[in-house]
């Protein structure tokens, strides 16, 4: 059985490349997030657990919002572009807002981080996967082959994240 990867299909190229780049950007900081929080910022296990649970709860709310809005938008991309804008702000947010707030006012940092990560990454992953699946159905390509580029991107990003993290975690944030 031959694998059919339709590189000539512009919609496939968009979905695959966006997925690839999204997951690279996510893995550059997320793959070592807990290590950064505990080792670099000195958060306790309780603070880590609280942070993760609030992040996930907030992302569930944004997933519902994204789902309702994107269903109405169909294949229009305003939410995708909003999410892209949030991703571009990762470096400045992590270094100049999130890190100082977690160290000086944990509760405010917790809330702002949950909003940022929910909008950009945690719920954004579901938005991207749903959008890619809709594109696959409408423009005749396999969702799995397009989504595989995201997994490949995450693996590449995680590999380089470890290298850059050993130099400075801030490098990872700026590379996003």
Where are these regions (language model features)?
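Helix-loop boundary and gating motifs at the non-cytosolic
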Residues: 2-60
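Small-residue (Gly/Pro/Ala) motifs that create kinks and tight helix-helix packing interfaces
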Residues: 34, 66, 156-165
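Residue-level signature of mid-helix packing/kink "hotspots" within the transmembrane helices
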Residues: 56-64, 154-155, 159
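Helix-to-loop junctions at the C-terminal end of transmembrane segments
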Residues: 61-75, 164-166
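Cytoplasmic membrane-interface "Motif A"-like loop-to-helix N-cap segments
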Residues: 71-85
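C-terminal ends and interior cores of transmembrane alpha-helices
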Residues: 85-104
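Cytoplasmic helix-loop-helix junction between adjacent transmembrane helices
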Residues: 113-149
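Symmetry-related core transmembrane helices of the 12-TM Major Facilitator Superfamily/SLC fold
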Residues: 157, 172-176
């Amino acid at each position: 059985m031959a694998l059919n990867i339709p590189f000539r299909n512009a919609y496939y190229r968009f979905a695959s490349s966006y997925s690839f780049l999204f997951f690279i950007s996510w893995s550059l900081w997320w793959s070592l997030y807990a290590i950064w929080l505990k080792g670099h910022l000195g958060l306790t296990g309780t603070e880590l657990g609280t942070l993760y649970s609030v992040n996930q709860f907030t992302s569930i709310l944004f997933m519902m919002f994204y789902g309702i809005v994107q269903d109405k938008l169909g294949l229009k991309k305003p939410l995708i572009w909003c999410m892209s804008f949030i991703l571009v702000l990762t470096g400045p947010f992590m270094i100049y807002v999130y890190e100082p707030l977690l160290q000086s006012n944990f509760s405010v940092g917790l809330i702002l981080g949950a909003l940022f990560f929910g909008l950009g990454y945690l719920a954004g992953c579901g938005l991207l996967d749903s959008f890619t699946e809709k594109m696959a159905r409408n423009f005749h390509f396999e969702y799995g082959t397009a989504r595989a580029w995201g997994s490949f991107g995450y693996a590449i990003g995680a590999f380089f994240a470890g290298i850059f993290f050993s130099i400075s975690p801030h490098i990872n944030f700026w590379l996003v």
